[in-house]
Amino acid sequence: MEKLEADIVIVGTGASGLFAALHVPSDKKVIMLTKSDAENSDSFLAQGGICVLRDKNDFDSFMEDTMKAGHYENRKESVEIMINSSRDIINELIGYGVDFATKDGKLDYTREGAHSKPRILFHEDITGKEITSTLLDVVRKLENVTIMEYVTMTDIIEKDNVCYGVLAKDANNNEMSIEAGYTIFACGGIGGLYNHSTNYPHLTGDAIAIAIQHGIKLENVDYVQIHPTTLYTKEKGRAFLISESVRGEGAKLYGKDGKRFANEVLPRDIMTQKIREQMKKDDMPYVWMDMTVLGEEVI
């Protein structure tokens, strides 16, 4: 078995893993693992945008929108941190080179589901790709960070309830151990387990399963976020995502009777429920979306 050592091992090369790598002291050796190409993370697939506190007067509204969307089961202090740090993080992303849309020389904002007002920054309809590819380019230039592609974590190295790194295997099933003082899981969810998903198929919840096996505390694992709208297909595998900002900018949903059946900017779980109810009512595997209001150029 090949043995490697690092100060920190980060499992996952999406936005969170890359952002973590960028905040590690430069004298610390970092190894990042990904099951596929570094570009094949769900962070690359996000279309609509990223929310940010527009100004101090927006805090209460932003807080209420977020808590309501989470059925008030959110960890309040985490929501506060997310909101209060959002502007600094956006400025940091811009500093790395992320190009958000502007209007009249100022940042432009759109609206997405569950938000009562526009507070979403975006880059065309490929915001995730813009953010994550920019971060990846910066990380790849760091001398203290090594990215290992097509390497799958199989377990953690644990003794006396302490984590000392991870066990992994490469594309040829060659086993390796990576000993590290700190281990960061940033490896996504379980979308790849579903027949129909907007996620990459290799996202199979490995870290969640390993955490359960080792008694690592998890929270709200029964909550799976479902994106309400994809382009209908009978084929299995990754579906084409229709961005939430499409509805935020005015696209409407209709049943087979040609009538609207819901507010299109409801929180994702409720929007998904409304669509499923309409599909059952219509005895159809899909509903209709009219986005002509956006205009041919935008579409």
Model-derived features: positions:
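Glycine-/small-residue-rich beta->alpha transition segments that form the dinucleotide
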Residues: A180-Y182, A186-G191
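An anion/pyrophosphate-binding glycine-rich loop and adjacent beta-alpha core
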Residues: A38, I210, I216-I299
